[in-house]
Each structure stands twice: as C-alpha cells, then as structure tokens.
C-alpha cells in the first residue's frame, strides 16, 4: 500500500488539501494531517490562500499567509517546497522552513512566470534572511 511505502521510505511530505484527502480517504484535513504526522519526520499541507500547516511527527503549526496581489500562481507550490527544503537542510526547524517556503511562494505569485529575475533576487534574499 502507498501509505506503507511512505512510512518506510519518505522523511518529508508536501501535500495540498485534495491530495491529503485522497491519501487518507477523508475530507477532514486536521485528522488526515495528524495521521500523516504519525508516519513521516516532517512536512506540510499547503492550504492555498489560507497558508499552510507544517509539522514534525509530534507538533504542528499554522503558517499564516501574507495577503499579496497575485499575478501568476505558476510555480508557487514548487517555490514553497524549494524554500522549505533549503531552510530545513540548514536549520532542521520545520516552522522556520514553512515561513521561508511561504515567503518565497508569496514573492513568486506577484510576478509573471515561475522564476525570479536577477533584479528581483536581492529583495527575495532580504526577505528570507530575517528568518535565520
């Protein structure tokens, strides 16, 4: 079964609400998140405009979103994951990682496309540096 595979082989999981509901056969996000917490080291459930829930195997934390004017949501989930993984590899802190992932996703949705231009990188670096 897929859940057995995850438990035996996966440390960090990223999911959105529909994926989480399918994975556990439940529309209850809180219950499904608690089940996921029991089988992986850490991860997050992306909640779109409502932010995200990040967790380790014993605690969870809601990451509130900053409301921004979205131009293009392409790449937001990937940018969140990249920020989370980069921060987690440096800090081993799932809350800081979720905040950085969220900050990067907030920045990428304010521009067209899924990649920052060189001219935008200083603003992005400055924004995430406050979390370290």
What name fits each language-model region?
Residues 1-33, 50-51:
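Conserved beta-alpha-beta core of the PfkB/ribokinase-like small-molecule kinase fold
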Residues 28-132:
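Conserved phosphate-binding/catalytic region of the ribokinase-like
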